[in-house]
């Protein structure tokens, strides 16, 4: 896991690296509406941006999964931690 010392949004690749997840995992969680990154479009290309609060939630979800919880339970617990 890398440290992010900024209030600026980061790309999906940086978010995945910072939270010890994968880009594929974050995209899947987004399809399930467990996370909702900011989406910015430039022409036909779309970009996802994650803010520090998003990274905290992603990290909590991943930590709960690593402890043996299901994805749904991990999301519920991460949401309750707010």
Question: Predicted regions span which residues?
Answer:
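Arg/Lys-rich, alpha-helical DNA-contact motif
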Residues: 1-19, 31-40, 47-82
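Base-recognition residues in the alpha-helical recognition helix of bacterial helix-turn-helix
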Residues: 28
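Short coil turns linking two alpha-helices in DNA-binding domains
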Residues: 22-25
